[in-house]
């Protein structure tokens, strides 16, 4: 019999016993935050699990959750895990056909869907999921006329469970910590996604490592808004919460996230680089709209703090005296943190891609303890985290205690830890390929371990690192990340492997460039029109010229064009986590690549676009190619 502290549902029962009245999870609904205690959490999970058992769900079965971050979806996951099954979260913005592959591959038995939108997707593809027996829905709005026999209300399953009390606890106490708890599907940058099998031990031990290293406390609040299908969300909103007893908080909707963040003021916050850049961009827009004394205070103290952060990075005296820092905290830094909802934040993180130096240093300068972490789905989301005192934009910190890292052939990062996954579901050959003979997991990322500091520097995906025609090393993500540091650039795709020079396709950030265009008095009708304005091309040319000054001569961008649409996951150009699907992009945009290296000045491009409801259309545009300075 496993100790309850060794499994995720066991931790739910422990928390319900040792801290029954403490807040476990909150949900904002109709403008009001509703709090559920750990006793509530335990009861909800127990009743749903007993109901699942009555429906025939048991060990080895798979339960899929689809929707925004909601308490009931979290409870459903832990309930399934307590019965010996595995939870399989799916990206809620996936179109139906994209979702069909994962649901079928996972041998899904039960789906818990947030609302009518997700139920409709599932019903449209249910004939492609032969193992599916039940679809349980949370929000019943719009569901009155639905009579498909596989449908069940969430409450109805719980009611069924109330007559089967005791099943959940018995199953949890008999649970093997090495049983599969979570199947998190990879982003599928090179093909179909693979189901990464993570055990209770993987998740719990990784969460314990994180909680110990970051001093996560029972009193902490974490905002849960990132996609449930991302392993980081499962780690930091579920496993870390269950291990530490801290609270998970679900915003009302993606549209209210900014307001909900300010209201809650969490002590822990995780965002992608794009998320942090959006927050900074919004702050800059607001600052630009102020005048007089307010603007002077903001500019003065911002410049002082950022310069101090730069000096600190160079090992020099910051020059920001105690009085200046105190005044800045009172007039600028504190109010700004309060405005964005991070006044109480003790730990803030970014990961998944490099964050721009200016963005990173801005938040650090304003008193936000922003740090970079590194992990992947196959290692339960954690390998390294930066320390509070030495966080910098160039590394991903030191490997956490108990996690071994070494650099293999082709600079590939190799990892051995309690969080390393059990294998890919039904893919034994693929599993064998990603382990070395001595048991290290091949991350597929190229990196360097700094001999002096012991910190890990991520370079690029190992398979993407190539060479220019003259033999110069070429890392596309390194160039693309520098370009995306610009607030005006949403996405960048660089080409250069085996070529004489580097060229780049740019997708502009419509919001930021649109605001700039309005201030310049430049009219436009839509994204395609805005992107092809001569003034916008010159704006982006200036951003590229600035980046080129930081690059070695051989890999400086020589030619570029602006796309008439942003890259989209619905069009299979990027994954749901915004990773580039390079092979597909190279095929889809082959005419652009040919034009770059055929010395053409323009290209006529016709691309297919997919809408959220699955409908398809086409975008046709004449794109001008420009030489970069």
PLM segments and residue spans:
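Conserved AMP-binding A3 loop
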Residues: 35-39, 181-207
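Structural core segment of the AMP-binding/adenylate-forming
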Residues: 12-13, 55, 82-159, 539
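Conserved ATP-binding/catalytic segment of the ANL
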Residues: 399-468, 485
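ANL superfamily adenylate-forming
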Residues: 117-177, 283-335
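Conserved AMP-binding/adenylation subdomain of ANL enzymes
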Residues: 204-221, 228-333, 344
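Conserved ATP-dependent adenylate/AMP-binding module captured primarily in the ANL superfamily
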Residues: 94-124, 206-223, 254-268, 339
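Conserved AMP-binding/adenylate-forming core of the ANL superfamily
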Residues: 2, 25-70, 74-78, 95-100, ...
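Conserved pre-ATP/AMP-binding loop-to-beta segment of ANL
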Residues: 20-23, 137, 152, 162-185, ...
